Amino acid sequence: MSKAMSCEPTPWRATVLTLFPEMFPGPLGVSLAGRALATGLWALEVRDIRDSATDKHRSVDDTPAGGGPGMVLRADVLAAAIDAADAGETRPRLVMSPRGRPLTQAKVAELAAGPGPLIVCGRFEGIDQRVIDARDLEEVSIGDYVLSGGEIAALALLDACVRLLPGVMGKQGSALEESFSDGLLEYPQYTRPQLFEERPIPEILTSGDHAKVAAWRRAEAEKLTRARRPDLFATRPQPNRQKPPKNTTDG
């Protein structure tokens, strides 16, 4: 049985294959993503992998070839689930895995600009490598740690994508100024009260000088990135240096 959320037609649709469909939409059903889902800005289809099992016990896993602990998700069952969900479609096919390529903001933007991905959520000891190869699944990781399954990772990926879809965020500028949007971590944020436990808001932020505020934010973002993510700082894109406009009053 598949569970579709939002029956409105939409150009961006995510399909999730999981053994625990009740985990969705989860946090994607509230706040920005939830409102966008309810109004048809995106669609979420959740399909139970067990629906593709062929025996009376709805078995989806078996012991690892060569021995070892745990169980492995079967290639035949998962392939059938993928084929049923993606018949005739061409779109990204992802599997959440700690051995995958790290998810970056650039990858998120790429996925958000496309038709929407199919995401496989693994469980147990892993997935039979043959279905990863045969169905051209791209392994994606959200960090160097191991979760109980791919569902939480899929939720994180989808949340990151959905907020970039047109009409989801109130101000597109918010997305443009966030961490990683230009290869830097985001600058510190402040709001009222003006003084908190003898700690004031930096004076420059209340000066009204937009150029100085922008320069301060850029400098703070660079300082934070250099200290916390030197790897990111070393590979950040360099800002375009625009030439000053030619003085047309000169001869």
From Swiss-Prot:
S-adenosyl-L-methionine binds at G122, I142, G143, D144, Y145, V146, L147. One of its GO terms (cellular component) is cytosol. It is an enzyme of class 2 (transferase). GO terms for molecular function: tRNA (guanine(37)-N1)-methyltransferase activity. Coiled coil: none annotated. It holds the Pfam family tRNA_m1G_MT. Residues 237-251 have a biased composition (Polar residues). Its main location: cytoplasm. Signal peptide: none annotated. It catalyses: guanosine(37) in tRNA + S-adenosyl-L-methionine = N(1)-methylguanosine(37) in tRNA + S-adenosyl-L-homocysteine + H(+). Its EC number is 2.1.1.228. Gene3D superfamilies: 3.40.1280.10, tRNA(m1g37)methyltransferase, domain 2. GO terms for biological process: tRNA N1-guanine methylation. Keywords: Cytoplasm, Methyltransferase, S-adenosyl-L-methionine, Transferase, tRNA processing. Residues 226-251 are annotated as: Disordered. It is found in: Cytoplasm. The keyword Cytoplasm applies. Belongs to the RNA methyltransferase TrmD family. PANTHER family: TRNA (GUANINE-N(1)-)-METHYLTRANSFERASE. Specifically methylates guanosine-37 in various tRNAs. This is tRNA (guanine-N(1)-)-methyltransferase. It comes from Rhodopseudomonas palustris (strain BisB18). The lineage of its organism: Bacteria, Pseudomonadati, Pseudomonadota, Alphaproteobacteria, Hyphomicrobiales.
